[in-house]
Design a protein with these regions (language model features):
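Sec-dependent N-terminal signal peptides
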Residues: 2-10
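Extracellular parallel beta-helix/beta-solenoid repeat domains
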Residues: 10-316
Length: 316
């Protein structure tokens, strides 16, 4: 009986929570422009991966990349559509197949990581349609990846946002990691309807074109004990990007904890380290989502409330 129960417990575990086979490891580490579909736990022990990696759908739940200090880098420059590592949901009939419990650990990532539910791969049709229904936040979160852990990763950004957490993604953890290189935008973007991220104990040495972390209609996140070198740019901005691409933002950037972070290199005249309510509708496209009685369609304001900001320091 005990053996039967143990077997059932193993069968009930995440489908990709098993060691990669030798054949899978060889395919993963083969240089290619074609993304490798990861359905196992890869312990690379320092071996480099020279191709994009795709972790997609419920069948990839429990998958892991443990690089042992090795590098992940595609043969071509990473883009938003073909990222270095993609953790994506997939349309499955009337619903969505989403991965959960994915880990990326001890890797050097050249390019970017994209975590997406609705809108994965650049198709905005489902996201736009869902946003025009009153239960959009719940639907987006049910469709999106959850419990993705990023531990001791060095991001070497090459222009695009190194870590994008897409609409509805929940419980993302980023710890002990370093953001370096350059981004024309931010280092981390927490997009609308996402929630529950923990960003703790990281170093931001990256040069960005704007603030380091954008909290865009994302709630209940914890950004704690990080070190930011701002190079004259902003730090952490909380807002709601009303109307962009016609998508209605339902959730507000509320109930976030931003504490015990250290900022250096802030602008002398206007040091903007943590800004709660950074936009308040001041964008030309805010009217593009007009016509519905909820979310940013009804109110262009950021609506930030219940945020805790304390213990942060600015050094020169």
């Amino acid at each position: 009986m005990l053996a039967l129960l143990a077997a059932l417990a193993i069968q009930a575990g995440p489908p990709a929570a098993r060691p990669c086979s030798t054949a899978e490891m060889n395919a993963l580490t083969q240089r290619s422009a074609e993304p490798y579909r990861l359905l196992c736990r890869a312990a690379l022990a320092g071996r480099d991966v020279r191709r994009p990696v795709l972790i997609e759908g419920a069948e990839a739940s429990g998958a892991a990349l443990d690089c042992g200090g090795g590098r992940i880098e595609g043969p071509d420059e990473a883009t938003t559509r073909v990222p270095t590592i993609a953790v994506w949901s997939r349309r499955d009939g009337a619903g969505w197949s989403r991965p959960s419990g994915v880990t990326v650990r001890d890797c050097r990532v050249t390019g970017n990581i994209r975590i997406w539910g609705m809108g994965a791969g650049g198709s905005m049709r489902d996201l736009l349609a869902s946003s025009r229904t009153p239960g959009h936040t719940r639907a987006a979160q049910a469709a999106a990846p959850t419990q993705v852990r990023i531990e001791r990763v060095r991001f070497e950004a090459t222009g695009t946002i190194p870590l994008y957490v897409g609409p509805g993604v929940t419980r993302t953890t980023v710890t002990g990691s370093t953001f370096a290189g350059r981004s024309t935008s931010t280092a981390i973007y927490l997009d609308a309807e996402s929630a529950g991220a923990e960003i703790r104990g990281n170093v931001f040495a990256i040069r960005t074109g704007r603030e380091q972390i954008a909290v865009d209609g994302s709630g209940a996140n914890r950004i704690v004990d990080n070190r930011f070198a701002l190079h004259g740019q902003g730090g952490i901005f909380l807002y709601r990007n009303c109307g962009e691409d016609g998508v209605i933002r339902h959730q507000t950037p509320s109930y976030n904890q931003i504490t015990d972070n250290v900022f250096s290199g802030a602008a002398w005249l206007r040091p903007r380290t943590v800004v709660v309510g950074a936009r308040e509708g001041r964008r030309r496209y805010c009217g593009d989502d007009a016509g519905w009685p909820f979310g940013s369609s009804a109110d262009d304001g950021d609506g930030a409330r219940g945020n805790r900001v304390s213990g942060n320091r600015t050094t020169r």
